[in-house]
Amino acid sequence: AININNIDIKKILFSIGSAAILKKKITTKQQLSNLKAHLYKQILFSLRMNPSQQNTRMQIREQFDFATILYQKGLHKQSLTMLVKAKSQALDFDEKTIAYDILELEKIIESQFITRSISGRADQLIEQSEELSLQNLQASKLSNLSLKLYSILLENGYAKDEDEIKKIQNYFEEETKNIDLKRLKFKEKLWFYKANVWLSMLTQNLHSALEFSEKWVELFYEKKDRILSHPVWFIKGNTYLLKILYLKKDSVQFKYWYDKLEAAYTILPQTDNVEAL
């Protein structure tokens, strides 16, 4: 595999054109696309193996992949042990989509191969599966709502009159009427707060925008490990909060939140996405 550390992948992929490659007679024109695809795959593989490029989601997914290999090799108990550990980590970091996939493989193994241990475990797996399914449904609804409102804001700007404001508010209320706010976990809360920020901006409610941008940012300070796993969301939340405080000319609160952000930069991962912000 290609050894890549902190090399800019964009430079590797785009600095050498097809004409230059063909001129050097490295390959034929017919084989060029295959060569590029192979190079691209090797670069991605090397980046994945680089510890500095890994995040929690990738590590959990890797454990899930290993457990799948063990299952396919007939090592069912070993696979279950790894799945339980990966699922626990996924739930700790609110990676519920991966946790649900892990749980589905757990159910397959338990029901097909470990029949003597299924007593009592079946109810536990079913209950956990139903709970995760509900949480994923809520997360999907809230992320869809957030995306839709953000799209409206980018495409149309602020609501032009009272009729538009009422229409947007009615849409928001309809989409959130069945959401149980008390049961929301980190990601669902984040989507809910983001959706409220976009709603507040669309309706030009600066007070509400400040309230929910603060909730957005506070969510990360309550769970500081999420700053490391979701740095872009953390920085964007701070960006909106500071912009709103600037518009409100609240210099005291602006300095308070700015100083907290400065202190948090020491734990932010140094990735291209973070540096681009």
What are these regions (language model features)?
Residues 84-92, 126-134, 169-181, 213-226, ...:
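Amphipathic alpha-helical segments of tetratricopeptide repeats
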Residues 108-145:
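Flexible loop and strand-edge segments within Gram-negative outer membrane beta-barrel domains
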Residues 86-115, 225-229:
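Short, charge-rich amphipathic alpha-helical segments embedded
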Residues 63-72, 104-113, 144-161, 190-205, ...:
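Tandem amphipathic alpha-helical repeat scaffolds
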Residues 1-75, 111:
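Intrinsically disordered, low-complexity protein-interaction/activation regions
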Residues 94-101, 137-144, 180-191, 223-236, ...:
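Alpha-solenoid helical repeat architecture
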